[in-house]
């Protein structure tokens, strides 16, 4: 017993170092998710170091000061068999450890259960999403009318939408912006909403009741808003998008396809077919593109013959057009001591700055009239024609690309499912003379001689986050393996310690399925945290077995004693973590973390104390 007591600080040190190494992966997440992830391992590592010193220094001192009488009495009998929990454990574990065949059968069943739990991802009973929707207090409705619409048309459309949504009880107020940008946040910065200042562009800011004063989350309200606006009669070609503030890094579009190709015409043709594929998927909504319909422009050309006939100077025509549509400053008001003179300007109202018959009657100075001085109408010396204007040009990292973007709502709300559905629609579509694009998942293409569809948006953030976390997690596991090899002097024993890590998926996937919650980045964080807890539990068992197996006793008795004695502290540790995780179970962002910890701890705690001894029996 004294030898075991002396081993406590050493074992605790191993556990602390293993847990510290397990939390490092989140420090190596690149991209926009990096700043969101990096504080977690830093704070967790500091807390782990602090708790280690408390456990090996402060707790024994407090026991000596406050628990002296209990320590004198002792609980030798309880420690020997683990008490009531230990006896229950022995009753359950004894049949499993009775023979190698039973141990192998148990391990096979556990392995099949782990694979079956991961099968929930394949069957889509558990979906994958980087970050769930948060419960915010405001939403946005972004509206784009056809090019050439006036500010009045835009404002009229916004008011129709407000009237349609006005009876929703969760909405406190609306703020409408026609022809100008609303105050933008981080999401608006990334999506360039601050540049929305054209007459056909509008924005509605929907302010909601506080979270505690309404029964629905903001995401459910957004779905309701989108459904109500579907039946509204809008001008043909109008695009309306319901935008929710993202809980994590904002992107240009949740589902974003970038089309690369040899020339602009090919890119737009391919993008048009891709947009049709987007619209064919029921759960893809708010479909839009970066180029829209080809805009028209009014071209004012000077009639040189009439210019010579009326002896009108070109500069006079240009000055007239500039004054007509840009206004002019005729003087300054020097009130207030002249420190800040106020310009006196003559300019048309914004709504009247159009090229029509009235504008063409504007006088222009002429010298060919009787008496040598006079004026002619602007329409006498210019001709006006409507011509197609150039498409807007979008570039990503300096390379021209057309973009098709959309949101997801309904059966699936993660980009991976929209991507799979669109890829399937693209493969089944009749492309005719339009070249079919090659699908790329990551990285801009090197060869643009043929059309290429690159998936971006939330998928890019998801790919980078899970790739970096997964790779760093593998490195962390390798580091833990090396640490345990150095401690125990064995290459096989660390494999036994690390084997139960996948067992957490049994509880994690079942928990997400029961709560109908997606497997998110916070769920992945929970899995990483659980891996550290599993390693701690495994080291506790293996360390006890190693120091109890050299006394000539049967292996099964040693394994049962190790499980009986260690089961109670392992269970108490799990319960403490589960109580802490239960607090965030209702949080929309960290629900995945809470589910992973709660249900993963249940499955891993109950199975680890059986799997480790079963591996010893199976491989003895």
Question: What residue ranges belong to the model's regions?
Answer:
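Alpha/beta-hydrolase fold catalytic core
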Residues: 1-24
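A short beta-strand structural signal in non-transmembrane regions
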Residues: 140-142, 204-226, 256-260, 342-345, ...
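Hydrophobic transmembrane alpha-helices and their membrane-interface caps
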Residues: 30, 479-566, 571-587, 599, ...
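Signature of alpha-helical transmembrane segments and their immediate interfacial
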Residues: 76-129, 257, 466
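Solvent-exposed, membrane-proximal periplasmic/extracellular interface segments of envelope transport
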Residues: 153-250, 276, 305-327, 334
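Extracytoplasmic/periplasmic membrane-proximal domains and adjacent transmembrane bundles
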Residues: 268, 275-476, 485-488, 556-558
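Transmembrane alpha-helices and their membrane-interface boundaries in multi-pass membrane transporters
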Residues: 35-77, 204, 503, 537, ...
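Transmembrane helices with small-residue packing motifs
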Residues: 31-36, 71, 110-147, 189-191, ...
């Amino acid at each position: 017993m004294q030898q075991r007591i002396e081993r406590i600080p050493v074992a605790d040190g191993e556990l602390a170092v293993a847990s510290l190494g397990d939390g490092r992966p989140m420090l190596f997440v690149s991209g926009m998710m990096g700043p969101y992830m990096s504080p977690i391992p830093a704070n967790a590592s500091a807390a782990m170091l602090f708790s280690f010193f408390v456990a090996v220094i402060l707790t024994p001192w407090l026991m000596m000061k406050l628990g002296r009488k209990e320590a004198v009495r002792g609980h030798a009998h309880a420690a020997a068999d683990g008490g009531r929990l230990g006896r229950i454990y022995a009753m359950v574990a004894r049949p499993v450890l009775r023979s190698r065949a039973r141990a192998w059968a148990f391990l096979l069943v556990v392995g099949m259960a782990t694979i079956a739990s991961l099968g929930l991802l394949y069957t889509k009973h558990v979906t994958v999403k980087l970050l769930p929707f948060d419960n915010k207090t405001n939403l946005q409705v972004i509206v784009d009318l056809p090019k050439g619409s006036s500010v009045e048309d835009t404002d009229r459309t916004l008011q129709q939408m407000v009237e349609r949504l006005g009876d929703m009880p969760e909405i406190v107020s609306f703020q409408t912006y026609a022809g100008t940008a609303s105050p933008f946040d981080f999401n608006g910065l990334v999506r360039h909403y601050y540049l929305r200042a054209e007459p056909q562009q509008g924005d509605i800011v929907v302010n909601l009741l506080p979270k505690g004063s309404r029964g629905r989350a903001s995401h459910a309200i957004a779905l309701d808003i989108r459904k109500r606006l579907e039946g509204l009669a809008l001008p043909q070609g109008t695009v309306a998008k319901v935008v929710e503030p993202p809980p994590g890094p904002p992107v240009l579009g949740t589902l974003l396809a970038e089309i690369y190709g040899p020339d602009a015409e090919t890119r737009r043709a391919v993008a048009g077919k891709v947009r049709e594929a987007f619209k064919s998927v029921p759960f893809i909504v708010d479909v839009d593109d970066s180029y829209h319909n080809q805009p028209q422009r009014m071209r004012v050309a000077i009639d040189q013959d009439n210019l010579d006939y009326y002896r009108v100077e070109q500069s006079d025509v240009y000055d007239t057009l500039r004054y007509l549509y840009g206004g002019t400053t005729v003087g300054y008001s020097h009130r207030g001591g002249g420190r800040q003179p106020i310009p006196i300007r003559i300019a048309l109202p914004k709504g009247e700055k159009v090229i029509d018959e009235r504008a063409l009657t504007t006088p222009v100075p002429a010298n060919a009239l009787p008496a040598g001085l006079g004026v002619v109408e602007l329409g006498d010396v210019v001709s006006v024609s409507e011509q197609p204007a150039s498409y807007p040009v979008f570039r990503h990292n300096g390379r021209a690309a057309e973009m098709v973007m959309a949101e997801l709502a309904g059966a699936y709300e993660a980009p991976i499912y929209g991507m799979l559905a669109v890829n399937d629609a693209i493969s089944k579509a009749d492309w005719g003379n339009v070249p079919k694009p090659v699908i790329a998942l990551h990285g801009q293409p090197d060869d643009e001689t043929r059309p290429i569809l690159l998936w971006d948006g939330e998928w890019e953030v998801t790919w980078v986050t899970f790739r970096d976390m997964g790779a760093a997690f593998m490195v962390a596991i390798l580091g833990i393996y090396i640490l345990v090899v150095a401690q125990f002097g064995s290459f096989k024993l660390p494999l036994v310690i690390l084997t139960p890590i996948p067992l957490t998926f049994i509880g994690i996937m079942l928990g997400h399925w029961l709560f109908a919650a997606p497997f998110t980045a916070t769920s992945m964080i929970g899995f990483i945290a659980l891996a550290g807890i599993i390693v701690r539990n495994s080291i506790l068992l293996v360390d006890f077995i190693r120091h109890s197996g050299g006394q000539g006793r049967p292996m099964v008795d040693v394994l049962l004693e190790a499980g009986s004695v260690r089961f109670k502290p392992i269970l108490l540790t799990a319960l403490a973590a589960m109580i802490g995780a239960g607090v965030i179970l209702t949080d929309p962002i960290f629900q995945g973390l809470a589910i992973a910890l709660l249900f993963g701890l249940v499955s891993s705690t109950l199975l680890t104390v059986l799997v480790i001894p079963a591996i010893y029996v199976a491989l003895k």
